[in-house]
Amino acid sequence: MSRSETLFANAQKHIPGGVNSPVRAFRGVGGTPLFFKHAEGAYVIDEDDKRYVDYVGSWGPMILGHAHPDVLEAVRRQLEHGLSYGAPTALETEMAELVCSLVPSMDMVRMVSSGTEATMSAIRLARGYTGRDSIIKFEGCYHGHSDSLLVKAGSGALTLGVPSSPGVPAAFAKHTLTLPYNDLGAVEKTLAEVGREIACIIVEPVAGNMNCVPPAPGFLEGLRAQCDQHGVVLIFDEVMTGFRVALGGAQAHYGVTPDLSTFGKIVGGGMPVGCFGGKRAIMECIAPLGPVYQAGTLSGNPLAMAAGLTTLKLIGRPGFHRELAEYTGRLLQGLQERADAAGIPFVTTQAGGMFGLYFSGADEIVTFADVMASDAERFKRFFHLMLDGGVYLAPSAFEAGFTSIVHGETELSITLEAAERAFATLAKA
């Protein structure tokens, strides 16, 4: 048995499914999940000392690569002053100032400890601000595991083949309307009928939890116009896209300004952090200024603020996001060329430093239906062939991939050589 197999067997005795987040269990690809013991730069190393080029990046945060020395040093410095105070710090104010300066829509921001907490709080705030109960989300989009959002959710719920989670009361779900992603007509029709009941529309500006589906031309702009027309709060869930698609997030990249935004992953530099913010008039409704309650023992944790601040400052250098997108584009071009040469139906998508891989004969991937029509079984085989070649992809056909700024020529060569062998093997199957 490998060390990972031994550890997984033991983990299952004490941890449900042997993991602390479902997608890590490899149910989407089969086999035993890898247990990692070290990560550095563009690589992760498992418990059997096998080294892999990493395109998961801890599900997005590691845009600088793993164990960046400046981030580690910032955390070490803060460690000497304590782990947590449960009180305001200069670091959290500095973080708030930086986030508001980088993101076009942010007048004020509140720090929390996860992306789920950020989206949950933003929706509560939108409901409190508007006095309305119902919300709109989109099929295949995932906004964390709070009850009102696990309604036809993507990500892990999609991989497990369930449209919503047991344990979510019908009374919660009835206030969540789920519409097709990239279908502006469905939004227009729904708001024409029940717009007065809708507190907010929450959307991933790039749907990163049904792999990676960019917005159709005019979709985000149309959402903005519809929200303005019906007095609905527009929330961009930028937990995944924030500071990755562009320094100012997807909203800066696509030129559409939401009322509220949620962030996670990169904003914590690898530590457990989320935040939400937006227009001052809305944010001033939250406690202690207003009646909408939100709180958190570890919100603004100084260790996390140190890691996040350092990360955001480093990715702000000129040319950073252009270089990240260029590498990602070269990676996808190389994969597409090798799939085509092997006669394998294959489509890629890209939004800056995030990407999607689909075994599909479609010309493009635009909708949830397009995603579901892709060949998940072929992806499973591809995943393990790439793993054998020293490349770690997301262990699910429905999760986006991520590059970092330290992925370079060596990593590109390793990846494309492994892919060429993998596509050739698939072509013979």
From Swiss-Prot:
Main location: cytoplasm
Pfam families the record matches: Aminotran_3 (PF00202)
GO biological process, one term: protoporphyrinogen IX biosynthetic process
One MF term in the entry's GO annotations: transaminase activity
Residues with N6-(pyridoxal phosphate)lysine modification: K265
Protein's UniProt keywords contain Isomerase: yes
Keywords: Cytoplasm, Isomerase, Porphyrin biosynthesis, Pyridoxal phosphate
Pathway assigned in UniProt: Porphyrin-containing compound metabolism; protoporphyrin-IX biosynthesis; 5-aminolevulinate from L-glutamyl-tRNA(Glu): step 2/2
UniProt cofactor(s): pyridoxal 5'-phosphate
NCBIfam families assigned: hemL, PRK00062.1
Family: Belongs to the class-III pyridoxal-phosphate-dependent aminotransferase family. HemL subfamily.
Protein name per Swiss-Prot or TrEMBL: Glutamate-1-semialdehyde 2,1-aminomutase
Organism field: Azotobacter vinelandii (strain DJ / ATCC BAA-1303)
